[in-house]
Amino acid sequence: MKTGRYIGIMSGTSLDGIDVVLAAIDETLVAHQGHYVHPIPHEVKTAILAMSQGQETTLAAVGELDRTLGTLYAGAVNQLLQRQRLTAQDIVAIGCHGQTVWHQPDGSAPFTLQLGDNNRVAALTGIATVGDFRRRDMAYGGQGAPLVPAFHHALLAHPGERRMVLNIGGIANLSLLLPGAAVRGFDTGPGNMLMDAWIWRRCRRPYDANAAWACGGRVLSALLTQMLADPYFARPAPKSTGRELFNLAWLERQLQRWPGVDARDVQATLAELTARSIADQVQLAGGCERLLVCGGGVHNPLVMARMAALLPGTEVAPTDKYGVSADDMEALAFAWLAYRTLSGLPGNLPSVTGADRPTLLGAIYPVNPYDAGVAL
């Protein structure tokens, strides 16, 4: 087994920063040892949003963004190493998810595309890098997502409790950790994505701090019902989604019948959409004793309170309470997936993604033996 220190990199659909974590990993333990959040420049966010919402682009723009993200990821890793007083030689490998710009798991030509040149990550850090995790699962008929339920199961499953782990990033995804049953997981729908997009559109703020804006509005029941009628919510698992569906264009179509609506009421309704779509899926799966929450949405007190109200008898709590950082969960997961790949172990769960078999995930970008230090 390739035990030792790993670094995980995650930049999700919320675009709230590049999360970089340091972890010591072996067969039984993932020990969180440090983290750093690297800012994403405004012009890079703009380019990502343009591509991921289906705007016309060019191959040159795709290539330039791929290179830029690779450079940003490497810079984030080097910042973490400096802060932890470590060198590249102290790290076994980096697990780099990349930035999803399009995820199309269904139809006649399913594919997923994450940008962030891992050749540059390996070259600029001097550390072997594992990336492009999702496409191998899709090659075996899977959705390529979610991949984190395997990690949730390894760290948070309990033999005597019905537990579910909920990640609320831009998209929300749920892992079902039920005793005696195969692990299942899927995307429930929008997490922070629509709330963040709406407050940016109306207030030029990147997110609704403490849900203060949403709390100034009221839920529009008819609008909520209309939103929940989107076919995605009724689809059975395995399923996954992203910004290519739940984006501002989707929201604007929903609002066509509501001219002059108060913007705060829309925000309140979007918060309720996130909470309700999650709670509905928890109940459809038979409920649970504990719903353990991670991702940026754990800091939204309105969504957390509404989930607790919609799920009486269920403890709704951050994963921190059970020993795993809610903010660093996904980056830790990709460090762990890199460990799995280098150790010759499968990283996907066919019961989650729908793939027809377990498989190693990702491509390996090795250290260059001809580098005398890394100065590019």
Curated annotation (Swiss-Prot):
Function as written in the Swiss-Prot or TrEMBL entry: Catalyzes the specific phosphorylation of 1,6-anhydro-N-acetylmuramic acid (anhMurNAc) with the simultaneous cleavage of the 1,6-anhydro ring, generating MurNAc-6-P. Is required for the utilization of anhMurNAc either imported from the medium or derived from its own cell wall murein, and thus plays a role in cell wall recycling.
The keyword Kinase is annotated on this UniProt entry: yes
Keyword Kinase: yes
Gene Ontology MF: a single term: ATP binding
Alphabetical list of HAMAP family matching this protein: AnhMurNAc_kinase (MF_01270)
Pfam families documented for this protein: AnmK
Lineage of origin: Bacteria, Pseudomonadati, Pseudomonadota, Gammaproteobacteria, Enterobacterales
GO biological process: 1,6-anhydro-N-acetyl-beta-muramic acid catabolic process; amino sugar metabolic process; peptidoglycan turnover
Gene: anmK
SUPFAM superfamilies: Actin-like ATPase domain
Protein name: Anhydro-N-acetylmuramic acid kinase
Tree of life domain: Bacteria
Family (UniProt): Belongs to the anhydro-N-acetylmuramic acid kinase family.
E.C. number(s) listed in UniProt: 2.7.1.170
